[in-house]
From Swiss-Prot:
Lineage: Eukaryota, Metazoa, Chordata, Craniata, Vertebrata
KW Coiled coil (keyword) present: yes
Disulfide partners: none
Coiled coil stretches, renumbered: 28-50
A Pfam family this chain is assigned to: EAP30
UniProt source species: Xenopus tropicalis
Record function comment: Component of the endosomal sorting complex required for transport II (ESCRT-II), which is required for multivesicular body (MVB) formation and sorting of endosomal cargo proteins into MVBs, and plays a role in autophagy. The MVB pathway mediates delivery of transmembrane proteins into the lumen of the lysosome for degradation. The ESCRT-II complex is probably involved in the recruitment of the ESCRT-III complex.
Annotated protein name in UniProt: Vacuolar-sorting protein SNF8
GO biological process, one term: protein transport
Keywords, in A-Z order: Coiled coil, Cytoplasm, Protein transport, Transport
Protein location: Cytoplasm
UniProt keyword annotation of Lipoprotein present: no
UniProt GO cellular component terms: ESCRT II complex
Family in the record: Belongs to the SNF8 family.
Quaternary structure and interacting proteins, as annotated: Component of the endosomal sorting complex required for transport II (ESCRT-II), composed of snf8, vps36 and vps25.
Length: 257
């Protein structure tokens, strides 16, 4: 027996049903989008009211400022965006991070001859606080990170490199890849590293280790001690400065020397 073909009417019916389902789906999607837009608008309004109410706390308290920034991020609001909108006029946070960015640049330039353009976030934070004086708004390390991210518009000069549980701030336009970052992390505890330490810890060939260290030397980010016992030591000024400061604090507080 031959199967009967599907009639033109049935095909038309099927297409009409599909079109209706598609139309219904579009309407539902538009409704959901409208509801989400209304919710976001309501969140934004509430956030503006919250900001107006807690304006002074946001400006003066670094921890409160972090929480506020996180609240803004959840609905895609950037209080640091340039331009004179509600946020910059209400809170002055745009000006705050701009001024902080300028101060960060000044500190990094002043110390560049000493550390080659790399500094720990903790040391940068200390210098920034020292330069601001007692009457200025308090600044947290989170504030410094946010200000540095805004400085990226100036080019690839400024960046943040994770090292262990902390960060290094890069203020020179040196190209640092993953190999360089791993070596910086390895040098974190002592402030220096050797070719053999890199080879044994990272399972690298000699040439790869030397290539990375030579690049750091060329960029002024590392110094070499050729007279060190055993083999040459490659010192990272940013790291050993921080370690030296830690040691002084321990000595002053009566800790182990």
């Amino acid at each position: 027996m031959h199967r009967r073909g599907v009639g033109a009417g049935a095909i038309a019916k099927k297409k009409l049903a599909e079109a209706k389902y598609k139309e219904r789906g579009t309407v539902l999607a538009e409704d959901q989008l409208l509801q989400m837009s209304k919710q976001l608008e309501m969140f934004k309004t509430n956030l503006e009211e919250f900001a107006s109410k807690h304006k002074q706390e946001i400006r003066k308290n670094p921890q409160f400022r972090v929480q506020f920034q996180d609240m803004c991020a959840t609905i895609g609001v950037d209080p640091l965006a340039s331009g004179k909108g509600f946020w910059s006029e209400m809170l002055g946070v745009g000006d705050f991070y701009y001024e902080l960015g300028v101060q960060i640049i000044e500190v990094c330039l002043a110390l560049k001859h000493h550390n080659g353009g790399l500094i720990t976030l903790a040391e940068l934070h200390q210098h920034v606080l020292k330069g601001r004086g007692k009457l200025a708004q308090d600044v947290s390390q989170d504030d410094i990170i946010r200000a540095i991210k805004k400085l990226k518009v100036l080019g690839n000069g400024f960046g943040i490199i994770p090292v262990g549980g902390s960060y290094l701030v890069q203020s020179v336009p040196a190209e640092l890849n993953m190999d360089h970052t791993v070596v910086l992390q390895l040098a974190e505890k002592k402030g220096f590293v050797t070719v053999n330490e890199i080879k044994s810890s990272l399972n690298w060939e000699t040439e790869r280790a030397k290539h990375v260290l030579e690049h750091l030397l060329k960029e002024g980010l590392a110094w070499i001690d050729s007279q060190a016992q055993g083999e040459a030591q490659y010192w990272l000024p940013a790291l050993f400065t921080a370690l030296y400061a830690q040691q002084i604090n321990m000595d002053e507080n009566g800790g182990p020397s």
